Every structure is written in C-alpha cells, then in structure tokens.
From Swiss-Prot:
GO molecular function: DNA-binding transcription factor activity; transcription cis-regulatory region binding
Descriptive protein name: Ethylene-responsive transcription factor ERF105
One GO term describing the cellular component: nucleus
Entries under SMART domains matching the protein: AP2
Organism: Arabidopsis thaliana (Mouse-ear cress)
InterPro entries, sorted: AP2/ERF_dom, AP2/ERF_dom_sf, DNA-bd_dom_sf, ERF_plant
DNA-binding region(s), chain positions: 71-129
Gene: ERF105
Taxonomic classification: Eukaryota, Viridiplantae, Streptophyta, Embryophyta, Tracheophyta
Role noted for this protein: Probably acts as a transcriptional activator. Binds to the GCC-box pathogenesis-related promoter element. May be involved in the regulation of gene expression by stress factors and by components of stress signal transduction pathways.
Alphabetical GO biological process terms: ethylene-activated signaling pathway; response to heat
Pfam families for the chain: AP2
Compartments, record wording: Nucleus
C-alpha cells in the first residue's frame, strides 16, 4: 500500500517536472510533450480507478404451481381445460362410473374421494386422506336438516287443514240448526206424532153446530 502511494507521488512529481521543463526550456517538438503528458495522466488514472467487480445475477426458474403438475387419482384433464372424475365400481366388475366434470383438478379429486369412500369405506385409497368422510357427513347433515324442515312443514299443513275442517263442520251444523228444511223424514215424524195424545195443532176439539140455529149441541167424548 505504501509503495503504490509512493509510486503515485513519483509520477505526479515527474508530470510536474515535465511541465516545469516545458515552461522553462524548449522540447524538441510539441507532439513529444503531449504524448508524455498523456502517458503520465493515463497511468495515474488507471492506478486510482478501482477495478469493477463483476456481479453475477442469478437466473430465476419459472414458478410452476404444484396443483397443475400433480396427478390425482381418478381425474383426467379434458382437451378444453375441464377435469373429469370417474371411478371403477367393484360391485359391477370394475365398470367405470362417471362422476362428472369439474372446473379444477382438486374439485374433481374430491369428487372421486367422496365416491371411493362411499364404495370402499376406510379401505379406499384417497387423494386427500385427511378429509375422508367430511364431505359425506356434510351431505348427511344437509339431508337431515332438509327432512326435518319438510316434516315440520307437513305437520303444520295437516294442523291447518284439520282446523279448517272443524270450522266448516261447525258452520254447517249452525246452518242446519237455524233453518231445518222440510224433508219426507221430518213430515213422517210429524204424522207419527199426530197419533199420540198430544196432537199439536190437531188437539183442538171438534166444533159443534151453533145453538142459535136450532141444532142440538154434540159432545164428542
């Protein structure tokens, strides 16, 4: 470090000496003086300027999503971008059962898992083992809630119909009590009552001839 500093001072001193010599004495030619000055200045600047360090920029590889590269069991990608799910039914000699078309591979994989768990139970090989049975339980809960709501609605409708029928029967009974129509049965009861001692309107005694006309009075016993 000290030697380079000393060398730089010597070069600066030599440049000053050349300038002084040019001012006080004459050089053989102006070109010789210019070339000497250029050599001194360039050598001085090259020593002062530190070398540039080359920095290597790392190249980043394109990020590829794991979901696009992973192959799920029972899932196939269609040419138009959708994902189809299917499963082999052991009860039908391994016949493929179509499960539907999904927008993403994960949805199709979950559809396969649901069908596989329903067919094979705990022995099924699933894409998402930690989610085994969750979708099935959720579906059962929804069905149970739907059935309860349906039963409650049916009971309410039955009660409403029963109340309406009772109200209609009451109204019919009231109308019959207010105005009893003349029917053959009612006339039959009327005539049957005429044979009794209390004959209603027919209980009036027979009229005898008027005595003022000279007829004797008839008494009916």
């Amino acid at each position: 470090m000290a030697s380079s500093h000393q060398q730089q001072q010597e070069q600066d001193q030599s440049a000053l000496d050349l300038i002084t010599q040019h001012l006080l004495t004459d050089f053989p030619s102006l070109d010789t003086f210019a070339s000497t000055i250029h050599h001194c200045t360039t050598s001085t600047l090259s020593q002062r300027k530190p070398p540039l360090a080359t920095i290597a920029v790392p190249t980043t590889a394109p990020v590829v999503q794991e979901n696009d590269q992973r192959h799920y069991r029972g899932v196939r990608r269609r040419p138009w971008g959708k994902y189809a799910a299917e499963i082999r039914d052991p009860n039908k000699k391994g016949v493929r059962v179509w499960l539907g078309t999904f927008d993403t591979a994960m949805e199709a994989a979950r559809g396969y898992d649901k069908a596989a768990f329903k067919l094979r139970g705990s022995k099924a090989i699933l894409n998402f083992p930690l989610e085994a049975g969750k979708h099935e339980d959720l579906g059962d809960n929804k069905k149970t809630i739907s059935l309860k709501a349906k039963r409650k609605r049916q009971v309410t409708e039955d009660e409403s119909q029963l109340i309406s029928r009772k109200a209609v029967k009451r109204e019919e009974a009231q109308v019959q009590a207010d105005a009893c129509p003349l029917t053959p049965s009612s006339w039959k009861g009327f005539w049957d009552g005429a044979d009794s001692k209390d004959m209603g309107i027919f209980s009036v005694p027979l009229l005898s001839p008027c005595p003022s006309l000279g007829h004797s009075q008839l008494v009916v016993t």
